[in-house]
Curated annotation (Swiss-Prot):
Family: Belongs to the bacterial ribosomal protein bL19 family.
PANTHER family registered for this protein in UniProt: LARGE RIBOSOMAL SUBUNIT PROTEIN BL19M, RIBOSOMAL PROTEIN L19
InterPro entries in UniProt: Ribosomal_bL19, Ribosomal_bL19_CS, Ribosomal_bL19_sf, Translation_prot_SH3-like_sf
Assigned keywords, A-Z: Ribonucleoprotein, Ribosomal protein
Protein name: Large ribosomal subunit protein bL19
Record function comment: This protein is located at the 30S-50S ribosomal subunit interface and may play a role in the structure and function of the aminoacyl-tRNA binding site.
Species in which this protein is naturally found: Caulobacter vibrioides (strain ATCC 19089 / CIP 103742 / CB 15) (Caulobacter crescentus)
Keyword Ribosomal protein (UniProt): yes
Keyword Ribonucleoprotein on entry: yes
GO CC terms of this entry: cytosolic large ribosomal subunit
Domain of life: Bacteria
GO molecular function, one term: structural constituent of ribosome
């Protein structure tokens, strides 16, 4: 009984947070730009982190996604909680075609072998229009 109450509270909290912010529909393989609030001393600024979404995990309040980018020739991955207050916005720059839910194999690839084909319809296409 107590577990059901906790699950219900988490579901309500998740619905409340999702209604408060616009989170686009994205999947692994999509190129994202995540605008993150960074606090430096007294100042707060927004930093853009752009890369390929290689994984989504969890559900509800605990949902997270991993973004991988190459910075100065070195692979950098960052895990973001989806409903984190430090995320200002998420933009889908490019939609990719992949057949896997987790793209961890990209860690071992460089250059052309790490490319992901673009899904027809571009970033504005919704999941309902694709067949």
């Amino acid at each position: 009984m107590a577990i059901n109450i906790i699950a219900q509270l988490e579901q309500e909290e998740s619905a409340r947070l999702l209604a408060a912010r616009a989170i686009p529909d994205f999947r692994p393989g999509d190129t994202l730009r995540v605008n993150v609030k960074i606090k430096e001393g007294e100042r707060e600024r927004v930093q853009a982190y752009e890369g390929v979404c290689i994984a989504r995990a969890g559900t509800g309040v605990h949902e997270s996604f991993t973004v991988r980018k190459i910075s100065f020739g070195e692979g950098v991955e960052r895990l973001f909680p989806l409903l984190s207050p430090s995320i200002e916005s998420i933009e889908v720059k490019r939609r990719g075609v992949v057949r896997r839910a987790k793209l961890y194999y990209l860690r071992d690839r460089r250059g052309k072998s790490a490319r992901i084909a673009e899904r027809a319809g571009g970033p504005k296409a919704s999941a309902s229009t694709e067949a």
